[in-house]
């Protein structure tokens, strides 16, 4: 499990793992449990990250499908663009191997989706900062180097396939109206069971939600409005999926100029505190 941002966005890696340890940089062994199987084996994960970080373009084009389950990666890419999980582009993901005896290919699983559909995980001020707005960039291709290289090099027409897959999923699982109906169904269950009222009474104005009032009906309206605006954005000229610009022009030897805070959110260059640039951490404090 990618529990923190340390090395989990694949911009750099060090072969310094210890198979007797439960953690390695931002990664945490979950299955098999380290208490049941010790030593564990970080080599498969290390080899995959090292491949993303250090392979030349031709090797990456030729072999990336041997290291990663690309159809699953593509679906997760689209999933992130639709619901905008600002805490999940590298962090809060499970990496797993199907059967190491047959293939080292990694797949992924989703984890911890509290900071999605216009929500922010720490309930700060403002409650809905710009980076969770529906009409702003998620930054998938700039955040996780694996997606950056897939898109930049347009591996096996990755960009065209991403667009086609989005249009396909938009008819079913990621259809705007179906998503709204799903949230409505969950709300109805909470309301009819009395759970919504109990939760509102228990947690309204609590510090865990930033001293805000908890109102499920208002939250449902906010999510429905957010989804409507998000799909408008995804079909606009600024869309990170539907675009005629297929090749991101970038010298692979040059670092990404975008700067992120520890939450993976884009920040300005003069941001004070812990910043991540090109996968490396920098601490800036006021003089």
Can you describe what each PLM-predicted range is?
Residues 111, 263, 277-280:
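Short strand-coil-strand connectors
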Residues 274-287:
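C-terminal tail/sorting-segment detector
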Residues 17-45:
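Long, well-ordered, tryptophan-enriched scaffold segments
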Residues 39-90, 96-98, 102-243:
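Middle-to-C-terminal accessory/interaction subdomains
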Residues 1-26:
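Conserved ATP-binding subdomain of kinase catalytic cores across diverse folds
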Residues 239-263:
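Residue-level detector of functionally pivotal "anchor" positions at catalytic/ligand-binding pockets or at interdomain
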Residues 266-269:
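C-terminal trimerization/auto-chaperone modules of long, extracellular attachment fibers and adhesins
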